[in-house]
Amino acid sequence: MKNSYINDNFIVSPLWTQAVDPQKEKKEKVVKILKIILKFTKLFIYAFLFLMGLWGCFQTMVDPTVKTSTTIGSGMEFGFPFGSTGDFRYDLTSGANNEYYAFTSTQWNISDYGPFFGLFVYPGAMLVLSIMYPLRDVWGGLDALLGIFVLLFIIRLITFLISIRSTMQSERMSEIQGKLAEINAKYKDVKKDMAMRQKKQLETQELYKKYNIKPFAMFEQMFVTMPIFLIVYRVVTILRPIKVINLFNIWALSASPLSEITSNLSNGGWVFIFFLLIIVPSQIISQKIPQILAKRRNANARALSQKGNDSAKKMRISQTVVMVVLVFVVVQSPASVGLYWFLSSLFTIAQSVIIHHYIVKRKTKGVSLEEKLRELGIK
């Protein structure tokens, strides 16, 4: 008598003999290729932006043809060709005996002032100029305010996904601090043991892989932020119509706050003290808000490793150094740069709040951030 019954019509194939779905295999190959293409595309874009930022920075320092001046009709200016509108605020013309370099609205090329001005500064300056001219007679320089606001809005819209990715990476890093602390405690006294150090490094890498953490992704925003700052800086300092504006009939956008306070204090320069009291705190707040919101989101994940504490400390120091440098630049630059800085800080605060509520909402609903990032193509 047989111990088992086998149905001839039912055949079970071992796993190793099961046929592979060719469509699935093809799809996986396509996805893999697309990921590689996306990776190298992002690498190329970031490298290009970084190099263009360096190009613009060095060109600003050494090229006399792109230097700016607070005096109208002097230095490099962007506007319409002479005689186009009949309005001296918009038509480019030099002052008497001034070194002058006209960058007109018809010069969309890289042969005159290089790729940084041709590819990046020109589109931004043209956008602001196109907004300001139809509104040229509005009160208090609101045309300049609107022009810079729209430029920043478009830039922030383009870079929003990068900001989300950077924030998500920081979020995940905060969430695994407890596990990192456990790994560091486990290998606390292995500084001279190369094998154990390698094992510790391997466990850390496995943890990063599990939570899809890419340490360098948190610095992506920096590669984009600095070139953008330089681009908008050049836009607001070379636009001729901005140089003639008194914002709210109080602050001359072509004037340097530091120069006005130190050399013209009793003759109206004192108003720039209030200008700085608005500009500088707004930027400090915009830097603190993301940190405060991150602490609220991760109130239960406070167990930081020593390495985590050191990294957080270094991050705070570097942010402080950058802040001090930017304050120095803004204080001695034309007030138009301060106006841009103020609007930028408002965008940063709004962006931080939006991302915060998005993350909290996802956590409340129990939706995996990983899944949503895949849907958005951010991961």
UniProtKB/Swiss-Prot annotation:
Main location: membrane
Species whose genome carries this gene: Malacoplasma penetrans (strain HF-2)
Protein task: Required for the insertion and/or proper folding and/or complex formation of integral membrane proteins into the membrane. Involved in integration of membrane proteins that insert both dependently and independently of the Sec translocase complex, as well as at least some lipoproteins. Aids folding of multispanning membrane proteins.
InterPro entries given in the database record: YidC/ALB3/OXA1/COX18, YidC/Oxa/ALB_C, YidC_ALB_C
Membrane topology summary: Multi-pass membrane protein
One Gene Ontology CC term in the entry: plasma membrane
Keywords: Cell membrane, Chaperone, Membrane, Protein transport, Transmembrane, Transmembrane helix, Transport
Family named by the database record: Belongs to the OXA1/ALB3/YidC family. Type 1 subfamily.
Transmembrane segments: 36-56, 115-135, 144-164, 213-233, 235-255, 265-285, 322-342
GO molecular function: membrane insertase activity
Localization terms from the record: Cell membrane
An individual GO BP term: protein insertion into membrane
Gene that this polypeptide is encoded by: yidC
Protein name per the record: Membrane protein insertase YidC
Oligomeric form and interacting partners: Interacts with the Sec translocase complex via SecD. Specifically interacts with transmembrane segments of nascent integral membrane proteins during membrane integration.
